Amino acid sequence: MTAICTDKTELNASWNTVSSAWLTRYPNPYSLHVVSADVLERYVDDEGRLYTERLLVKQGRLPRWASDLLNVNKSYILERSVIDPSKQELKSETFNLDHVKILRVIEYSRFIQSSENCSKTIVDTIAKFVSPLRFGLGRRVQKYSLKRFQEQLSSSRRGLLYVIQQKFQPS
C-alpha cells in the first residue's frame, strides 16, 4: 500500500541562489531535528552537473504507538541531488535507510527557474509512503507520516529561505 503527497511551491529567489543554498541549508532554526548532514560523495561530471550524496541524521519525537514499534528516535536518510546549471534544474531524491520494515519514505524534488519570473524558483515535490505492515497498522503509519511530512514541508521551505536570507541576501 502506498500513500502519496504532492506539493508545488514558488520561492522568491532565483534558481542560482536556491541551488547554492540547497547545499548549505543545514543547520537552520527550522530544521532542528536534523542532527547532522555529511557529504558521502560529490563530483562534477563531463557535462558540468554537480552530483552530491549526503547522509542526514534526523531525530524527533514519535507518537506512543510508533515508539513501541521502533524503540528509537533517530533516523538515517540518504539524499542524492544533481544540480544542472545548463538546464537550471536541481533534482533531489531522499529516502530512509532504516525502519524500512515499518515504513519507506521516498521524496523527489525538482527545482527550476520560473518561466514567468527569473527571480523566482518553482519547486515540485512528490513523496511516497510505503508500509508493508498489515491489519490497518500500515495505513495508520502512512497516515501519520503523511500528516507529519505535510507539516514539515513548509518548515523545510522556511529553513531554505532563512539560509538564502542569511548567506545570499545579507542586509
Curated annotation (Swiss-Prot):
One of its GO terms (cellular component) is extrinsic component of mitochondrial inner membrane. It is a peripheral membrane protein. Residues 2-171 form the PRELI/MSF1 domain. GO terms for molecular function: phosphatidic acid transfer activity. Its main location: mitochondrion. Residues 1-79 are annotated as: Required for mitochondrial targeting. It comes from the Eukaryota. Pfam families: PRELI (PF04707). GO terms for biological process: intermembrane phospholipid transfer; mitochondrial membrane organization; phospholipid translocation; phospholipid transport. It is found in: Mitochondrion inner membrane; Mitochondrion intermembrane space. Transmembrane segments: none annotated. Keywords: Membrane, Mitochondrion, Mitochondrion inner membrane. Required for maintenance of normal mitochondrial morphology as well as PCP1-dependent processing of MGM1. This is Protein ups1 homolog. It comes from Schizosaccharomyces pombe (strain 972 / ATCC 24843) (Fission yeast). The lineage of its organism: Eukaryota, Fungi, Dikarya, Ascomycota, Taphrinomycotina.
